[in-house]
Amino acid sequence: MASLHPPSFAYMRDGRNLSLAESVPAEIMHMVDPYWYQWPPLEPMWFGIIGFVIAILGTMSLAGNFIVMYIFTSSKGLRTPSNMFVVNLAFSDFMMMFTMFPPVVLNGFYGTWIMGPFLCELYGMFGSLFGCVSIWSMTLIAYDRYCVIVKGMARKPLTATAAVLRLMVVWTICGAWALMPLFGWNRYVPEGNMTACGTDYFAKDWWNRSYIIVYSLWVYLTPLLTIIFSYWHIMKAVAAHEKAMREQAKKMNVASLRNSEADKSKAIEIKLAKVALTTISLWFFAWTPYTIINYAGIFESMHLSPLSTICGSVFAKANAVCNPIVYGLSHPKYKQVLREKMPCLACGKDDLTSDSRTQATAEISESQA
């Protein structure tokens, strides 16, 4: 992320060097942080590469998340309270790419932000809102897996009403955080190569810097700690279960107890937890660079280049592509329904054999009720 070489001004206008900030239209010049005046415009090649990558990622994300929403809402066996979190995740990922990638591609074609100050703020707000909702949807999924696997029968079953209330809280709080920069706590500004907008992480006053810090605590650190807590206890529960199974098998003088129905149910729950853990791990690796960029900006600890900042933004948006792929490859019941409804898109071996599908469906529905 740090720039290893100082910028070299290769672009000239009226006999003087042209900076990156001077490439934007006059109507949004006041929104550009002075930091960007030290950089020349990017080579046109980079706009083409970034636009192409975003277009591919956006198309894949829109198609993949639409399919996830369709499969989970159209299949009765998948319409469970727990899977409402999955559908919400797919919806927020879909909306993030729906609102993010067309402007980046369009502005990349012109080499700068051409959509005016209002749409810049709207773009930044949508990115903040849908990114926050996606992160907290994955947090709810992780905590739900914790309740199912660790607490087991001792837990209070999740109802549809409880799931809806949790999602309403997430949308309300994330919406409030996304709106705050529009009312004076920080602001949304052009960033990187000037084809996208985000929070102002180069603000010099601590009032605006505090927004980045507090927001990151809500949208990054708190979810991360919740996820670590959930999966730490899940791994402990799985290890304890495996140890108990081995000891019981030794007492019964048999090789394995894997044929028991209780163990089949536990295996399904563990597989679903692995799917969620994979999804969340991908989110962590996608959003961590962008978080580092924000902190590097407010604490002035790195000399950030336009290319590094826009790549961090693109990397974060790429997470919206990963989730439908993970569920398509790993979620047993999802794969089964996808194979039935869209056989041309099904991939991999069906984890549920014809003799066990009815039982597995009941187990999944029952465990997520």
From Swiss-Prot:
> Which stretches face the Extracellular side?
1-46, 110-123, 187-210, 299-305
Q: Which residues lie on this side of the membrane: Cytoplasmic?
A: 72-83, 144-162, 239-274, 331-369
Spell out the subcellular localization from the entry.
Membrane
Q: Which residues carry this modification: N6-(retinylidene)lysine?
A: 317
Swiss-Prot/TrEMBL GO biological process terms: cellular response to light stimulus; entrainment of circadian clock by photoperiod; G protein-coupled receptor signaling pathway; negative regulation of transcription by RNA polymerase II; phototransduction; sensory perception of sound; thermotaxis; visual perception
Topology of the protein relative to the lipid bilayer: Multi-pass membrane protein
Pfam families reported for this sequence: 7tm_1
On modification after translation, the UniProt record reads: Phosphorylated on some or all of the serine and threonine residues present in the C-terminal region.
Recorded superkingdom: Eukaryota
Record GO terms (molecular function): G protein-coupled photoreceptor activity
Tagged with keyword Mitochondrion: no
One GO CC term, this protein: plasma membrane
What InterPro entries does this protein's entry cite? GPCR_opsins, GPCR_Rhodpsn, GPCR_Rhodpsn_7TM, Opsin, Opsin_RH1/RH2, Retinal_BS
| Sugar attachment sites | 17, 193, 208
Keyword list, A-Z: Chromophore, Disulfide bond, G-protein coupled receptor, Glycoprotein, Membrane, Phosphoprotein, Photoreceptor protein, Receptor, Retinal protein, Sensory transduction, Transducer, Transmembrane, Transmembrane helix, Vision
Which cysteines link up through disulfide bonds?
A: 120-197
Q: What does this protein do?
A: Visual pigments are the light-absorbing molecules that mediate vision. They consist of an apoprotein, opsin, covalently linked to cis-retinal.
The similarity comment for this entry is: Belongs to the G-protein coupled receptor 1 family. Opsin subfamily.
Q: What is this protein called?
A: Opsin Rh6
